[in-house]
């Protein structure tokens, strides 16, 4: 189908189909990701009806990857990255090796050459950035120990894939034609590693000062549009520069841009302002993956598809599980990492495309990679759901490591009661929290920012890291015997869900919440809040009171 405006058609068609099928998936109690992928299949060239631009869609999806990784970087400090390097580096490399060997074994069964097997195996070895991060975000695990290990593991995988993409042409020439010597290969590898190190060094030394400075200057203008624009310009600009100047992936470039901004107080505002765009383009990523999938392969090569899927779901996951256990982490952590990595994504598509261009991977190989990606991404939410049920039935506190036990079970003294439970410690929450502390009211803070939680704990303030929508987090904060629940988070509808859950757990608790609009006030009140404060209304009321109060020292005549 010819489109006069392919960009607009692709965005509108992709988002509309994703919305419809995402809603249907949600209605059927399955992950919306499945709906987004099916939307891509319907919009792709292999099914009748509407066909989106298959060249534009992946580029739009890459924007989602950039913004998503930038957001992750905003919550991921260099200290966090260094804390997991001992397991992330050897673990990721070993897991890539296992997956590659399994892929080579399958390719040998299919009658492909050694080099084809290596490329095919590498395609099956690296997880999707978007899928992994979405899974962690949905379960509020980004800031947990498990989340930090998974993200560190992902970063190492991305670095290995960057090296692979640069070295593959030289290796292919050496193995297939014999005209590339080891010295040339070593030089290429040295240059690539040098570029990666140079990029990281520049971001740590120069970007660490320059990026926060630019953000501070844009914030000082008082223009929200300029601030949001500066966030997007930095995220996209650094990611693009990383690719063009250093041959580093878009995802890694954006990640380090976010990480150097992490130390700035503006990082949370930046994360909040880019959230809608991140979500929209992340959806387009899943749609673009679905567009590449030809459903006929499920009929033409069912056994090969099942074998490919088995390598992704079980081969690499079991390798990751045993490696994490080998490093002394709990079963919970090992299973979470294994489930997170039980899928493939962006780099698999890029590597498969390069393999096709170099005549190293047949069309059948690329089709198997795409089938494995689609099916593994669809099944990933199911794996996590099964994992959570299994852990709920079998895991005990004794099975966790001491470190995890402290983080997840002993954040709050067991004897605290009749306290104020404050959800959110941003601009509003911090002002309120300081007043409560000054009044000697027992206080527990629930906050999603690890940095803020660490700062509060250093001051001796009880703080729980996590999302208040999670019942386990509320249990840690002792909701059942709290006297007040105060919600200062800006999302009124999320606050309403928290209110309903809290009211069911503690019918007598006094609940005060924040809202921005009249419909949010009504919604939160219906869910069980005692009082809802709308910021704009309170500002107007206070200003009116000031107008009615005569200034000090001035005589009012009437």
From Swiss-Prot:
Pfam families: Na_H_Exchanger, TrkA_N. Gene3D superfamilies: 1.20.1530.20, NAD(P)-binding Rossmann-like Domain (3.40.50.720). The chain crosses the membrane at residues 4-24, 32-52, 56-76, 86-106, 113-133, 149-169, 186-206, 226-246, 248-268, 280-300, 304-324, 337-357, 368-388. It comes from the Bacteria. GO terms for cellular component: plasma membrane. Residues 25-31, 77-85, 134-148, 207-225, 269-279, 325-336, 389-558 are cytoplasmic. Residues 417-534 form the RCK N-terminal domain. The keyword ATP-binding does not apply. It is a multi-pass membrane protein. AMP binds at residues 427-428, 447-448, 467-468, 494, 514. GO terms for biological process: potassium ion transport; proton transmembrane transport. Its main location: membrane. Residues 1-3, 53-55, 107-112, 170-185, 247, 301-303, 358-367 are periplasmic. It is found in: Cell inner membrane. This is Putative cation/proton antiporter YbaL. It comes from Escherichia coli (strain K12). The gene is ybaL.
